[in-house]
Every structure is written in C-alpha cells, then in structure tokens.
A protein has these predicted regions:
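Short acidic (Asp/Glu) patches
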Residues: 28-32, 66-70, 103-104
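Short, conserved beta-strand edge motifs with alternating hydrophobic and charged residues
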Residues: 5-7, 49-50, 61
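Short, charged beta-turn/beta-strand-edge "cap" motif at the junction between a beta-strand
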Residues: 50-56
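Short beta-strand-centered aromatic/proline hotspots
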Residues: 57-67
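Compositionally biased, charged N-terminal/linker segments
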Residues: 1-43, 136-137
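Short glycine/proline-enriched turns and hinge-like loops at secondary-structure junctions
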Residues: 17, 41-42, 57, 75-77
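Contiguous surface segments at macromolecular interaction interfaces
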Residues: 1-10, 71-137
C-alpha cells in the first residue's frame, strides 16, 4: 500500500463536504505529474486530505475506493479521477507552516513541489504527520 496527499480548495470541496457525501470522485486535476500519481493509486491506498489556499493544512485521511478512470469533466480525455472515501479526521490539523518548520520534512513533495496537487508521501512522513495530527497511522 502507498500513501498520498491530495489538495483541494476548501471553499470548492472541503473535508466536511467529503464526510457529508461519504464518497467522492476526485476530479479536475489538470497537471500531468499529478495525474500520473493518480494512475498509480490502488484501491485501499491511504491519502491525506489537504486544504489548500485557505487553511493550508492536512485535515484528515481518505482511502482510495476506486482506481483511476477517465475524468468526465475533461474534454481532452487525457486526465483521470479516483473515488475516495473519508477514513478519519485529524484531531489537530497539521499546518504547512508546521511541516516546513520541521527539517525531517525538507524532502517532502508538499514542500519541494508546492504547486503539485497530488503527491506521494513516504512511510516516515506518513507516520510523523499522523502523530502530529493525533491519529494512528
């Protein structure tokens, strides 16, 4: 199983929206590297839900429920979606500032490729961020 991070602007689609819907298609990704990461995702992979722009924080854990398929909102047919379900909210959101302040995250894609909306997360980073958020990995 791999771990990932996916970003969403909370005024467009937030953690609370996902919890309310219980399952959602993660659409609208138009970056080729991010889309390549989505193609690598497998059912059961765990994903951090990151609120971008507003908050700039990891707020919960999702699970990939359905592997990639064509994004119905993409007229070019180049991009894909995955379906995700909420697993658990963080007891304490982990902010981007906290992550950047800790040297052990210096090589995390969230820090090194800040505009990338979908990125892999190493086992060590996953465990450390879960601990910071007050949840078990």
């Amino acid at each position: 199983m791999k771990h990932w991070l996916m970003k969403s602007e909370p005024d467009t689609f937030s953690w609370d929206h996902l919890v309310e819907k219980k399952r959602s298609m993660w659409d609208g990704v138009r970056n080729h590297m991010a889309a390549a990461h989505m193609r690598e995702m497998k059912k059961g992979d765990l994903v951090f839900f990151y609120h971008s722009n507003i908050g700039k924080e990891i707020v919960g854990v999702m699970r990939v429920e359905k592997e990639h398929y064509p994004d119905p909102t993409d007229e070019t047919a180049k991009f894909v979606v995955v379906d995700v379900v909420p697993v658990k909210p963080f007891k304490k959101p982990v902010t981007l500032a906290e992550i950047k302040a800790n040297k052990k995250f210096a090589d995390m894609r969230l820090v090194t490729h800040s505009r990338l909306s979908v990125s892999p997360v190493s086992e060590a980073h996953w465990a450390a961020i879960c601990k910071m958020g007050g949840v078990t990995p």
